[in-house]
């Protein structure tokens, strides 16, 4: 494809959110064009033409709850408690649970989640049998878990919901739009919840 020599010597944490910096928009657009051209050249590009999802089964199949907040986690002792508590504090007109898939954390995350799950009946702490799942494998495990709800809603282990009605709004959007996926926005903050401008 191409070779790029790294000239940015900042630590990774300092450049973590460069992708949302408006000053980098031109580079992002250029990279998107390059990737699109490559996919077209190798016959792997998919035209953005999508059929409406088949929702005839919605509401027919039995689920243990309406929604599950899915949190994949690995070694996030500093942030996962806030994420879990944010999910557990949602106010909804439907039953929901929180499924945390702990990918064999070694920093105390596992013990913390075990403690939290003893105090919260709707918190399901899953440690997979396999050690090599990664974030996608953890997501897949949660989506196929017997306690997963009709709607699986992502929350990263270092994120919190912006308010107690966020989950309700997401499920309302699923229902009203009869869609297979809902994508929202987020606000970057520091650990004191102060917004970080792009």
What is each PLM-predicted segment?
Residues 129-147:
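Glycine-rich, basic loop-to-helix element that forms the pyrophosphate-binding segment
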Residues 85-95:
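Short, acidic, metal-binding catalytic loop of nucleotide-sugar glycosyltransferases
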Residues 95-104, 127-129, 156:
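Short beta-strand/loop segment that forms part of the nucleotide-sugar
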Residues 164-197:
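Conserved donor NDP-sugar-binding/catalytic core segment of glycosyltransferases
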